[in-house]
Regions:
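Short acidic capping loops at alpha-helix termini that bridge into adjacent secondary structure
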Residues: 9-10, 50-51, 73-76, 152-153
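N-terminal alpha-helical segment
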Residues: 23, 37, 86-90, 136-137
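Rossmann-fold dinucleotide-binding core
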Residues: 2, 53-123, 127-131
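Structural signal for conserved beta-strand scaffold positions within catalytic alpha/beta enzyme cores
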Residues: 13-15, 77-78, 120, 221
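NAD(P)-dependent Rossmann-like dehydrogenase/reductase catalytic/cofactor-binding core
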Residues: 102-105, 112-123, 142-146, 151-232
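Buried hydrophobic positions in well-ordered alpha/beta secondary-structure cores of metabolic enzymes
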Residues: 11, 26-29, 55, 83, ...
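Rossmann-like NAD(P)-binding element
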Residues: 1-54, 61-62
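Short, residue-level hotspots on alpha-helical faces of the histone-fold
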Residues: 131, 135-139, 160
């Protein structure tokens, strides 16, 4: 309890972006949308001190493309934390075309100081993890569409057969089906590989406003507290 209270005492929530001017390192974690991130980084670039590193928690948007919206591409980097962040030890650090080695080293050390295990990747569509993860989830959705298995059996198969802590469908609900769809589109646009194309069922669910846990409905149904509701 004492450790928790000490940690909370160091947090200073604010709705003012100007507060970032006092930061030594900035990590952006807004919605997965390039235009929104680009506008935010343009503002942060003018607010933060010149030596401050700007990092994005993006899981799919090119780092070099976002860095171009700032005057510090050498101090711009990808720093993706995985859901659920409190229990997932991995941080994927992605180097843009102009990211300096000093920026990479600082970000690696910061990740370690947070108790995370960092890996580094180059700035290519999907980086490392989503290059593997997106086709996996897409295949699970195709299996559901084709009636090969129920959503429960597909998720149980991944958990017990592949030793995954969450099944692909429940994890997609957790991440957000709209987010997964956006990542599919980014990867398909960048790589033109059909395995990254969004399954029709995924697109249909998103168009219906079923985004997963945050909307109360995705592949499963959820209560306001995020707990799953059993189908009647």
């Amino acid at each position: 309890a004492a450790k928790r209270d000490a940690t909370l005492a160091r947090l200073h929530p604010t709705t003012s972006l100007e507060a970032a001017g006092r930061a030594d390192f900035v990590v952006e974690a807004i919605t997965e949308n390039f235009e929104a991130k680009r506008e935010l980084f343009k503002r942060l670039d003018s607010i933060c001190r010149p030596e401050v590193i700007l990092a994005s928690n993006t899981s799919s948007i090119p780092i070099t493309r976002m860095a171009a919206s700032t005057k510090r591409p050498d101090r711009f980097i990808g720093m993706h934390f995985f859901n659920p962040v409190p229990v997932m030890p991995l941080v994927e650090i992605t180097k843009g075309r102009d990211t300096s080695e000093e920026t990479v080293a600082t970000t690696v050390e910061l990740s370690k100081s947070l108790g995370k295990t960092p890996i580094t990747s180059l700035d290519y569509p999907g980086f490392i993890v989503n290059r593997m993860f997106v086709p996996f989830v897409n295949e699970a959705i195709h299996a559901l569409m084709q009636g090969i298995g129920t959503r429960e059996d597909i998720d149980q198969g991944a958990k017990l057969g592949l030793h995954h802590p969450m099944g692909p469908l429940e994890l997609a609900d957790y991440v957000g089906l709209d987010t997964h769809l956006y990542i599919c589109d980014v990867l398909y646009e960048g790589l033109h590989d059909p395995k990254f194309a969004a399954p029709p069922l995924l697109r249909q669910l998103v168009e219906a406003g079923h985004y997963g846990r945050k909307s109360g409905r995705g592949f499963y149904r959820y209560a306001p507290d995020g707990s799953r509701i059993a189908d009647r």
